[in-house]
Amino acid sequence: MNQFIDIHPKVLDALRSGKPVVALESTIIAHGMPYPKNVETALNVEKIVEQNGAIPATIAIIDGRIKVGLNPNELTSLGKLSNVLKVSKRDIPYCVIKKYSGATTVSATILIADMVGIKVFATGGIGGVHKDAAATFDISRDLEEISEKQVAVVSAGAKAILDLDLTLEYLETKGVEVIGYKTSEFPAFFSNASGLNTTFQLDEASQIAQLMYTKWNMGLSGGIVVANPIPQNYAIDKDSLDKAISSAILSAKDNKITGKELTPYLLKMLHSNKDITSLESNIGLIYNNAKIAALIAVEFSKL
């Protein structure tokens, strides 16, 4: 294995024996939620993956070592620290040589999962094309990594703060299938009403696993996006959500928040908005994605 990577013994055993494994990102722990809710949520996500038959592998960088699978102490430490870097692909070598701790974004998690052979990854929502990207060129690295690596990404669509239409256009250009799990409408993270179509709809985890297997055994490159709608009891009314997002974006512009700081800032603004329950919704959709990802990983391990 890569000299810079430490794989948790349980994860390593699963990979060597062909057992199902689900990769999990760590940005949500360090930058997505306040402590202690972040640690509690991350531990519950791992539990949900296990309860549905797969081995969880939370990915992060701890003191310059890339970790695939965290122990509870490492996970708690990551949730408590205030100086944890937000690590995308370009930041990994810097974080390693400086022996820093870093929380991996969707793109970095996909990259590391692919390095060690994990084929399924659960997250809240993927990054994508930001609003006003025509002027700012702010497009998440997540989309490139999804298009290049053979990993299935289970998410509640793309984060609601993004331009969802352009995000889907970008994925289409890159040849990435967007599979709606039991839906033909692309979910909008906190809401299921985007008015946009997925590439295909599949209703069974086994069908998604078969599509992954077929695509990659045909020699086709790249991953797939499994768009899994937020459970209805956690969904936020679209009009209320749109107002909250507009307010958050305006605040970001006023405070000149850009680049890698933008998404955490916008999500923080949504979580603090008293008119919506975005933190509870975020947790609900992540739990749901972890369950579906585990079911897909189990089915894929049978092929």
From Swiss-Prot:
Location of the active site: E25, K159
Top-tier EC class:
lyase
Task: State its Enzyme Commission number(s).
Answer: 4.2.1.70
What keywords appear on the UniProt entry? Glycosidase, Hydrolase, Lyase, Manganese, Metal-binding
Q: Which Pfam families match?
A: Indigoidine_A
UniProt binding sites for Mn(2+): D138
Biological process (GO) annotations held by this record are: nucleobase catabolic process
Q: Which residues bind substrate?
A: K86, V106, S140, R141, D142
GO CC term, one of those recorded: cytoplasm
This entry's comment on the bound cofactor is: Binds 1 Mn(2+) ion per subunit.
Q: Name one GO molecular function term.
A: hydrolase activity, acting on glycosyl bonds
Q: What does this protein do?
A: Catalyzes the reversible cleavage of pseudouridine 5'-phosphate (PsiMP) to ribose 5-phosphate and uracil. Functions biologically in the cleavage direction, as part of a pseudouridine degradation pathway.
Subunit structure, interactors included = Homotrimer.
Q: Which family does it belong to?
A: Belongs to the pseudouridine-5'-phosphate glycosidase family.
Q: What is this protein called?
A: Pseudouridine-5'-phosphate glycosidase
Native organism: Acholeplasma laidlawii (strain PG-8A)
The organism's lineage is: Bacteria, Bacillati, Mycoplasmatota, Mollicutes, Acholeplasmatales
